[in-house]
Amino acid sequence: MIRQRTLKNIIRATGVGLHSGEKVYLTLKPAPVDTGIVFRRTDLDPIVEIRALAGNVGETTMSTTLVNGDVKVDTVEHLLSAMAGLGIDNAYVELSASEVPIMDGSAGPFVFLIQSAGLQEQEAPKKFIRILREVTVVEGDKRATFVPFDGFKVSFEIDFDHPVFRNRTQSASVDFSSTSFVKEVSRARTFGFMRDIEFLRSQNLALGGSVENAIVVDEYRVLNEDGLRYEDEFVKHKILDAIGDLYLLGNSLIGEFKGFKSGHALNNRLLRTLIEQTDAWEMVTFEDAKLAPISYMRPVAAV
């Protein structure tokens, strides 16, 4: 049986919010079967919980924000991408502020934290959402699509008319049956344009952003001294973001996501459209792991 997974131990980290610039204390904790990923604002009294589900998404400007009434948690996508990539079904994410810390701008530090905590298999089958037919949403020239696929695959294309992007790969397709999320996707960092940063800061966004936690591009070049981690790091980061956004289905996916210039808003619209079209998907479990089109790394012993 492919089982649900949680963390073996509690683990903590500290960072700053990309948009708020605030110091944030993050604690990841194990959670019981069928809990899902639940964010908890421990700085509030009483503590407010928000489940990581598509229907709880509020703002999608520059990041994905979960809301419960007037309480929010910003920038959840990189942590959720790490949870998805490592197959974590159930966890509590405790935060001392309204935003998940940006760390280095990728999912890599969250992968390290989760692997350091160790993974624990649980006594219940893991539930997958299997795509049965194509579902597409369009906004202008942007497009996001689910299609049936016996596994999990994410294809993405970006289209930036800019010197830095013209010479680099702007499309990628990652089939996770043959490609490691940890090695090939998790370290891709978020990116931004120098020309946009002043405007964003005037809107109280990107207050914590720097070359320490993002790829920064001016009119001609990448400003980070160390350059890029992957030749196709820009589009790989969009794949990383999409994996985090897709995990707001509440379950791992069997199917392919295709994005063309898609972002957090369109990704969320695709999830909501899929959920409404109940003939387009089914929930499945696998009693025999050998029959599953998706496999996960064996649980890692806590470091």
From Swiss-Prot:
GO biological process, one term: lipid A biosynthetic process
GO cellular component terms given for this protein: membrane
InterPro entries (UniProt xref): Ribosomal_Su5_D2-typ_SF (IPR020568), UDP-acyl_GlcNac_deAcase (IPR004463), UDP-acyl_GlcNac_deAcase_C (IPR011334), UDP-acyl_N-AcGlcN_deAcase_N (IPR015870)
Keywords on record: Hydrolase, Lipid A biosynthesis, Lipid biosynthesis, Lipid metabolism, Metal-binding, Zinc
Pathway as given in its UniProt record: Glycolipid biosynthesis; lipid IV(A) biosynthesis; lipid IV(A) from (3R)-3-hydroxytetradecanoyl-[acyl-carrier-protein] and UDP-N-acetyl-alpha-D-glucosamine: step 2/6
EC code: 3.5.1.108
A GO molecular-function annotation: metal ion binding
Residues noted as binding Zn(2+) in the record, renumbered to the chain: 78, 237, 241
Active site: 264
Reactions catalysed: a UDP-3-O-[(3R)-3-hydroxyacyl]-N-acetyl-alpha-D-glucosamine + H2O = a UDP-3-O-[(3R)-3-hydroxyacyl]-alpha-D-glucosamine + acetate
Cofactor requirement: Zn(2+)
Gene3D superfamilies for this protein: lpxc deacetylase, domain 1, lpxc deacetylase, domain 2
Xref: Pfam families: LpxC
HAMAP family listed in its UniProt record: LpxC (MF_00388)
Primary role: Catalyzes the hydrolysis of UDP-3-O-myristoyl-N-acetylglucosamine to form UDP-3-O-myristoylglucosamine and acetate, the committed step in lipid A biosynthesis.
Homology family: Belongs to the LpxC family.
UniProt protein name: UDP-3-O-acyl-N-acetylglucosamine deacetylase
Organism this protein belongs to: Ectopseudomonas mendocina (strain ymp)
Gene behind the chain: lpxC
